[in-house]
Swiss-Prot record:
Zinc finger (Phorbol-ester/DAG-type): 498-548
Positions that bind Ca(2+) 2: 468, 470, 472, 474, 479
Record bears the keyword Calcium: yes
Gene encoding the protein: Rasgrp2
Name the UniProt record assigns to this protein: RAS guanyl-releasing protein 2
Tissue: Expressed in striatal neurons (at protein level). Expressed in the hematopoietic system. Detected in olfactory structures and deep cortical layers of brain.
Ras-GEF domain segment(s): 154-387
Amino acid sequence: MASTLDLDKGCTVEELLRGCIEAFDDSGKVRDPQLVRMFLMMHPWYIPSSQLASKLLHFYQQSRKDNSNSLQVKTCHLVRYWVSAFPAEFDLNPELAEQIKELKALLDQEGNRRHSSLIDIESVPTYKWKRQVTQRNPVEQKKRKMSLLFDHLEPMELAEHLTYLEYRSFCKILFQDYHSFVTHGCTVDNPVLERFISLFNSVSQWVQLMILSKPTATQRALVITHFVHVAEKLLQLQNFNTLMAVVGGLSHSSISRLKETHSHVSPDTIKLWEGLTELVTATGNYSNYRRRLAACVGFRFPILGVHLKDLVALQLALPDWLDPGRTRLNGAKMRQLFSILEELAMVTSLRPPVQANPDLLSLLTVSLDQYQTEDELYQLSLQREPRSKSSPTSPTSCTPPPRPPVLEEWTSVAKPKLDQALVAEHIEKMVESVFRNFDVDGDGHISQEEFQIIRGNFPYLSAFGDLDQNQDGCISREEMISYFLRSSSVLGGRMGFVHNLQESNSLRPVACRHCKALILGIYKQGLKCRACGVNCHKQCKDRLSVECRRRAQSVSLEGSAPSPSPTHTHHRAFSFSLPRPGRRSSRPPEIREEEVQTVEDGVFDIHL
């Protein structure tokens, strides 16, 4: 039966199920494993798993009436294959697991021990960790002591730990998450996929933040060089997803406009940067990336955004069913969907060739939560290098890779709300790591000198006095934990940027930064931050997501007044751009900073 199925012409679910049963022989050997795996993986696209289990039970009962012992045993072999190949589906779906238990109980009641022994539902391990947005898995401690300072980390060390973080997050994504995203076109009620996209965007933003935290062009150029080599190591690890995140951060408008900084980057680094950028550019539907991925052997981490885009394109181009009655499924579409999802599923079957340091993982996790808005990053970029019509005198003729074509926006989601208890536990472990590695004299406190070292990893950490609550000249574990709990994005702040709100009067209507509605009246109906000037309703105070930034003027060399950043009119939390491919000898086009970008270039776009 399996050999007679013509998927291109379409078939019913029953025909496909019968074909999968017939794909087994009486001993359990599969003659067409690809068909069986494809149907068992893809069936939730068309019918619920509980309905498939009911159909299997019906097939078994019908074969018993027909005295077809061969069909009975083949049905049991298919159930066994289903449980062993997709165990998470049974652990996370109690209704489905109960149906299989009922089938096994029926076999036992009939005294058919041989068939019953083929179905083992009790030994399915737990997969509840896959549904937890925040989860610390045990990791192996490296033998040698590793520095937690960003400036001291080797590119391979940083690449390995970024790979581990993203791989751990990726392993929690299930088929149902992909199906939900493609069906809804967004990540509504999809916290696991939201979290992965959030982590991807955090890496890109962290790259920008680390570059912009340096006060001089030479220092910023060194950080750029460091991240280019991190991207090179990510390619060696065949981690294309994080590679794209790092390259996206390096190519973002807040970084690409830093002409003086780029003039200090060496020609060899620029050449390497261009090559890495060309690898992940969207040109030719990511043809360079696809060729490189196809040639990979062993562990590989594909760019999730590219493959999600492929899934969405298929969903829009081809129908799931070939008839109005929804009885004949589109086998050609199912085969194409399966090829994409199987590539993604293969990632979890191969562990990355890295060993992770728990202290560094904790530090990186918290560092990546230092969220900034588009406006804030661009304003900081303007402070580092104010606008100027004339180009700086360059020690070299090197230029950064040119800006890219606009990439389509295709996802916009809210940052998942993490479990507060889990975040508190994670912060405590991170603080313990900080004290273990930065408390040089071992007195159980962080001095001002030690605090300055820590700020290398947290560029926009609040002042020493803000953490030193009792003003005794040093920071205790409890004070640091208290600070991070207050400023954690989960608890309302943003890593030290908590608003100093007070009641305010306004003679004219002003807009609430949270709900965008006007604050009307001259009485104290609103709140205003004394530091950054943000306004909000009293009832919006606890939901205000924008971080506090002290107001700073950005004045061009010509003395013109500051102007809004290019992203001001398009409120999006993060999207990144990729440089446009071109000849290396050509100069990049001038970026007109005064123009407003109506759509920021990006693959992932997520409101954090």
